[in-house]
Amino acid sequence: MTGPDPRSAPRLAIRSVEPARPWFRPGRPASLLVEIEVDRSVLVSARLELLDLDQVVGSVSHRLRLRPGRTRRRFRIMLPTVPRHGYGLRLTLERGGAALACGTCAVEALAGWWESPRHAVLTDFRASRWMAATVRRFAPWHVTVVQFYDWMYRHYRYASPHDGTFRDALGRRVSPAAVREGVRSCHQSGIAALAYGSVYGAEREYVDAHPDERVFDEAGVPLSLGDTFFLTDLRPRSPWRRRLLREYAGACRDFGFDGVHMDTYGQPHHAVTADGTRFRFEDLYPGLIEEAAGRLASRAGRRVLFNCVAGYPLDAVARSPAAALYLELWPPAVRYRDVVAWIEHARRVGANRAIVIAAYISALRDSWAVPDQRPGAEEAVILLSSVIAAGGGYHQILAEDGRALVEGYYPAALALSQSSARELRSAWRFGARYLHLLSEPQLSPAPCDGIELRDAQGRPIPVSPQPDAGHVWLRAARTPKGLRVLSLVDLRDQRDDRWDAVRQRPATVTGWRIRLPGFRPPLVAMSPWTAHGEPAQLRAGRATSEGLAWTLPRFRRWLLAVERTH
């Protein structure tokens, strides 16, 4: 048995490269974790570069002695002081001036998770032994905040009165030790942990013991969700409101949560209390959010999110002190343009906060009975996430272990195939690297007038300023610094524009040319699924009275074109 030929180049591969946590503060060092595999002992040069678009804005170099097998290393590089900004990280390993391997990832410079709420959920709290590994698997997704869904004993009493594992109201087994381990693991990974906390009501045993805390419809029937959770009186100083706020505070104090996800149920919008008082929920929610945020603010960094179900009541709560705006979309908001319209509306009223869109793909659940529809259902997940990101929002779709949410009850989430999970993960990493170009709250819409797109044969390609089926959706914007940004989302092969439907996977396109009146060189373009999201400088053709024509790089599904700093 012989070893590798010492005269040949070593076989070396970068197996993983990712930030030690999803975000770091501007002006502080960022840490990068790398796993390298090599077939022999070798001395290499490692160069780590920090990239703003395609410009190197920081670089560090090291000499590494690698031994055979797998080696884990940590690198550090200083981030610029620019607030709320995304960067690429590129690690190159060289020997004798020749590159042996290269790996890339993204990192965000943030004041806190709420500036980039890349949201996911945990649903399984049966045992603590696998919790740390489960949380670590969120790292490649650049998740910044995790909601602990249905972690509590009851909706009216979060901590169990009994020691050890319990059954929740729907019969699921929950270990408080697993919940605590999950929170601890999130903190170790730099991820915020939010406790799910229902606003809407309590189980039957509670309202049977407190009948005056129920609310009713106009016919005097108690309002409930499937006769399981009963809506309760949320008026200021009501017993239920005081209890709810105590439970929120106790969850953060006793379990270490970083805040609470305040869940509502949308309909109904009105109710009658036991004493005959009529009220609108939208009149009560702003004060409740303010009270909850104030109660949790005893420790810096604690925040609340509030679920505007079907967008209700966004305008009423938009100025309340929630960490970000969170909207859960349901019919009649069934088209891509409805999703984008909600993002744009939230941007107008949201006081420069990030926007999370919870939108679930029931087509994925339905496809399990029709296996040949499964790829199209998974494409629906990826395409919707792309539309939301191109529109400036964050998609709430991810549960632990690469599962996608298919309905409002999160434990029903279903696993994506490895290839689809990889595609979706690439889109999320892309959103992290370019967050200041995609989800910057102060992006201003820009017109798409005069933009022309042609294929490699010179034929015109239909475009639309709305995400309409049969077209390439164009979304143009200006950054606060005045740079133009243009997203192109390819919907040409879709037969309709419903977001919760089996979708056709778009083909890779090459040789397209685009005319961009008013855009000035240098111009770069990038796609999540081309060259790991790395920008490519565009070649401009001859200038005409209609402006420059640019050749676009090969891409699939979504391309982002940006004016670089002049």
What is the predicted role of each segment?
Residues 101-154:
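An acidic-aromatic substrate-binding cleft motif
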Residues 236-325, 329-352:
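Active-site neighborhood of glycoside hydrolase catalytic domains
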Residues 264, 353-450:
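Aromatic/acidic polysaccharide-binding cleft in carbohydrate-active enzymes
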Residues 152-202, 276-285, 291, 295:
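Aromatic-lined substrate-binding rim segments of carbohydrate-active enzymes
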Residues 543-566:
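C-terminal beta-strand-rich structural cap/linker in extracellular carbohydrate-active enzymes
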Residues 116-129, 159-176, 226-243, 271-285, ...:
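The substrate-binding groove and active-site-proximal loops of carbohydrate-active enzymes
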Residues 458-520, 557-561:
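Carbohydrate-binding surface patches
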Residues 111-117, 123-128, 195-255:
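Active-site-adjacent "subsite" loops/lids of carbohydrate-active enzymes
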